[in-house]
Amino acid sequence: MNAQKGFTLIELMIVIAIIGILAAIALPAYQDYIARAQVSEAFTLADGLKTSISTNRQNGRCFADGKDTAADGVDIITGKYGKATILEENPNTADGLICGIYYEFNTTGVSDKLIGKTIALKADEKAGKLVLETVNSKTTNVENKYLPSAFKKP
């Protein structure tokens, strides 16, 4: 009598079930990883605009050349997943002129978890850094788990 070679149907079904379970666990984790990577672009662009704000403040405004509105290419940077814009809050507030950066994600070409989401950052000039805060009525509505650890909301 010849010995059978190969796998039985039950063994193959068990392997397929295990692969399915692993895929069900890995897919959401991968989607979160993609969203976090896309959010990092916002902070990269904001870091470049932070330097512009510091230079622009020497002219007494948040925008380049002391203008009243953001100029494309100077105060507005378009990335692969969205657009970062310098904001200026009313200089007549008790705190004086407040500068910030507003990042808005594109409606296409980004993770489903980021469509229509925004990030608002205030330039803390004394500390020389950006902080997650409402600026000129613009807020952050990206889920906390996608933000870098230094910017997580309490």
Curated annotation (Swiss-Prot):
Coiled-coil annotated residue ranges, if any: none
Domain of life, per lineage: Bacteria
Record's GO cellular component terms: membrane; type IV pilus
Keyword Cell membrane: no
Subunit structure: The pili are polar flexible filaments of about 5.4 nanometers diameter and 2.5 micrometers average length; they consist of only a single polypeptide chain arranged in a helical configuration of five subunits per turn in the assembled pilus.
Modification N-methylphenylalanine occurs at: F7
Keyword Ribosomal protein: no
Family statement drawn from the similarity comment of this UniProt entry: Belongs to the N-Me-Phe pilin family.
Intracellular or extracellular location(s): Fimbrium; Membrane
Organism: Moraxella nonliquefaciens
NCBIfam families for this protein: IV_pilin_GFxxxE
Biological process annotations from GO: cell adhesion; type IV pilus-dependent motility
Gene3D superfamilies named among the record's database cross-references: Glycoprotein, Type 4 Pilin
Record field: transmembrane: 7-29
Residue ranges the record assigns to the propeptide: 1-6
Membrane topology designation: Single-pass membrane protein
Name this polypeptide is given: Fimbrial protein
Annotated keywords: Fimbrium, Membrane, Methylation, Transmembrane, Transmembrane helix
